[in-house]
Amino acid sequence: MSKTNKNQKSITSFFKNPGQTSTNDSSASKPKSSPIVETKEIKKENEEEILKMPSSSPPPGPAPAPIPSAQLILSPKKPTVAVCPTIQRQPTSETEWINLSDRFLLTNRNFEVQYAHLYAERLGSLRKIVTKAAENRWDRKIPIKRMNDIIPDEECILVGILFKQMILKPSIVKQIATENGFSLQPPRNRYVDPTDKLILEEETQRIELNGKIDVDQFVTGIVMAIRGYEDEKGVFIVKDYCFKDLSIPKQLSPMKDDQYILLASGFLLSETSIIFNQLEYLVNSLTQSSNIQSKQIQNILSNIIRFVVAGNLIESSNRLKETTNQAKYLTRKMTASSVEAMHSIDELFNKIAAITDIDIMPGVNDPSCHMLPQQPLHPCMFPSSSKQKSTHCLTNPYDFQIGDIRLLGTSGQNVDDIDLQSTIDNRVHILENCLNWGVIAPTCPDTLSCYPYVKNDPFIINDTPHVFFAGNQPKFETRLFKGPNNIEVRLICIPCFAQSNSCVALNLNTLECHEISFENQTPQIIQ
């Protein structure tokens, strides 16, 4: 063995065990009769040996680099990681994200109070605003009265909260009757009946409404002002009505470039799902948008700066099945199907979170309390994707801002519940009504479960959004609502992905939106 090889062996051994040297290395550099050398002398000797080592580099040119073996051990190189080209998707000052959903977070949970406090708080919060709207709409000579001050046949204005009396509405009494063997009601798509009545309530008393008001177009929980008179039967004959005035949203200025957010809902994954291919097409279209032939779709998908999932990640039947088989999962080493579904969703979100921000809202089927406002899903349900800062678990409803654009949305429970109790023609019209009524979910807590708030009502819409959406709807619908004072609000019904295989792309510059189908490998815009 040459001297160089001996020296290299000594160097390698030294850097593997700093401050020590092997017996063979010591004998190679000193006589056997030499005493044991101190550590400092060994370090000095090895440094001299490194300097004396012959260089394999040619004489001319810059000084030779340190030997590879020593350099590798001293400063090991970290493995390189492939990074997706996401520079164009990074939010700018024009698209900075602000979460405004703090009012939906439950910090102190107390379920020992009555739900009447929520209605009283809603009426108390909106009374002055609705009264002002009534004064602006009608002649100020018409008196605004409390119900106990009404004089029969004298025209006046009343302000109160609406209650819809429905004979077919589900109730706990009917549930108990069903459990005791009484006949069930036939399945219904709606609980509307010709005998339904509208009743206006306030702190003093209540009064039945009739006249120019369509019972089937209203639901419980709406604060409104009505103009009319009381007849000889004690029924208030309505001549006109109004709601709170919409606040004027911030004026939007044009952006330099078009930026988009992608809205999706209703994956409904389970062990029998058949949409895994479509979800894979969705991920591939987002991560490899440069391969898309359509320039229009390529421009949209390459400029997605946010992906919002409006609930219902898993199928509802899984939860029912697991409830009956709970003992089996506790006693045997078996995995619930919903766990496998959540694992698949986590892998999906992990890929998307690598290229853009993703906002996850819970839905009625998801592992979160069904009562509104639903709290954020726990990050432990997404062990991979939750490690990325671009993954955000949020509430339902979800209120947020991107740049100057205010967006407000739900996972669809509010729209579904209103559809059950009215004959409103389409879902986007329900969204428009909620906007005019000034309440996200007016039927909370009558027929839609919610937390029993006492001192505030978080469902009141104090600030008019620029975009108002609802997830898990039967089909894609959109409308540009135009109100007084040049107010414009984009209303969006997001289709259920498991049924439509499509998402909605919203242009933040123009507030226009497109339904994009991912039914096959080539995404298409549905006209």
Predicted regions and their residues:
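Extended recognition/assembly regions associated with phosphoester-bond processing machinery
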Residues: S2-Q527
